[in-house]
């Protein structure tokens, strides 16, 4: 087993195909996939190791997640259609850090019942078979070992959107991730917000197998009534 690093804007299929080109004489498989906009460590198995892939599917993982305040999309990251937004002057970092800190920080291990994210593979497959299925139909219990705020701050809004567009533009154009519509959306918002800053907090999450980071942020957003979305989901380690 070797650990490889996936960059943001790369789909899981593109990632594994790149590895296969480097090891043309070996059977290859991977586990612990990452969403296109996420980055970080992915374990890759070779040859007979693939027979033991099940041994690598229930591992705990650590993420650092930059959560943007005031915007929310249907995908809960920047590769999504905006559901709602709120002027940054009505939401401050003090609101989040002082008034809502308890929603973001967990010191002791808990089990939560979590929906499968709307854009998760299982939910997508279910809807392809039955359009009446929603992510509400699928839940599972997952472990959250700890969650804490490790950073907070603000970014220049236009520079941040430019970074978002650059990453979105890398996503496989042979697949329909709604890239054109989403990029046009961010361009429009960029041009209507002059001299604006956007606030963020960075969470460090230590979680169990099957934990949906984007769903976790959506659930917090729904609970506190403040638009939130993931910008940078970075898997920093896997506990082997």
Report the location of each language-model feature.
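Catalytic/RNA-binding core of pseudouridine synthases
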Residues: 1-240
């Amino acid at each position: 087993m070797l650990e490889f690093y996936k960059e943001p804007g790369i789909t899981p299929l593109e990632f594994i195909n790149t590895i296969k080109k480097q090891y043309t004489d070996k059977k290859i498989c991977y586990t612990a996939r990452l969403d296109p906009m996420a980055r970080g460590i992915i374990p890759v198995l070779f040859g007979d190791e693939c027979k033991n892939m099940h041994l690598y599917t229930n591992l705990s993982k650590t993420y650092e997640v930059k959560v943007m305040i005031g915007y929310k999309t249907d995908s809960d990251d920047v590769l999504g259609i905006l559901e709602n937004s709120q002027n940054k002057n009505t939401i401050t970092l003090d609101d989040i850090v002082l008034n809502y800190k308890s929603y973001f920080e967990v010191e002791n291990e808990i089990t939560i019942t979590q929906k499968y994210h709307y854009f998760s593979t299982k939910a997508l497959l279910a809807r392809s078979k039955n359009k009446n299925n929603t992510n509400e139909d699928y839940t599972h219990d997952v472990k959250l070992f700890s969650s804490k705020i490790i950073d907070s701050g603000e970014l220049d809004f236009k520079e941040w959107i430019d970074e978002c567009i650059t990453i979105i533009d890398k996503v496989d154009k042979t697949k329909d991730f709604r890239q054109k519509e989403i990029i046009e959306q961010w361009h429009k918002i960029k041009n209507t917000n002059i001299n604006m800053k956007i606030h963020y907090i960075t969470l460090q999450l230590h979680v169990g197998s099957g934990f949906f980071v984007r769903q976790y942020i959506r659930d917090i957003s729904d609970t506190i009534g403040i638009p939130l979305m993931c910008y940078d989901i970075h898997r920093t380690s896997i506990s082997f």
